[in-house]
Design a protein with these regions (language model features):
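Chalcogenol-based redox active-site neighborhoods
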Residues: 1-152
Length: 152
């Protein structure tokens, strides 16, 4: 289990254009790293659109927003285009970052047990350390909660 104050696990994953993006690319900037289950599903779409609506606020605070799911690059391209998402989406089909951040967990729905991404957001400081962990966030309010936290 990751803890506040520890080094955030490094990753290198493709973005929606196939470019490899690493967490270390953003040393010197704060990073909002949000893990979500699936492109184009109701909760994930609301969460992404809320981040898009708040994007200028993140930029004004020199904060990079990165969304990660196990969806394909093509899925991310379509998702970003459909909803005009201005931030980085990374594809993690091999669960590299998803597992290293501990968000691939058992889920229960109507008595059925499966594994999937538990919607979780990490705020990573300018030195690459975990500053805040927000587990099981609400998709509609996650972006606003982070902006409030950053403004404190």
């Amino acid at each position: 289990m990751l803890e506040v104050g520890t080094k955030a696990p490094e990753f290198s994953l493709p973005d929606k254009d196939g470019n490899i993006v690493s967490l270390s690319d953003f040393l010197g900037k704060k990073v909002v790293l949000y893990f979500y289950p699936k492109d184009n599903t109701p909760g994930c779409t609301r969460q992404a659109c809320a981040f898009a609506a708040a994007y200028e606020g993140f930029k004004a605070n020199n904060v990079v927003v990165i969304g990660i799911s196990k969806d394909s690059i093509t899925s991310h391209q379509k998702f970003a285009q459909k909803y005009d998402l201005p931030f980085i989406l990374l594809s993690d089909p091999e669960l590299q970052a998803i597992q290293s951040y501990g968000v691939w967990q058992e889920k229960k729905l109507y008595g059925k047990v499966s594994y999937g991404v538990v919607r979780t957001t990490f705020i990573i400081d300018e030195l690459g350390n975990i500053e805040k962990i927000m587990p099981k966030v609400k998709p509609d309010t996650n972006a606003a909660e982070i902006l409030r936290y950053l403004g404190e």
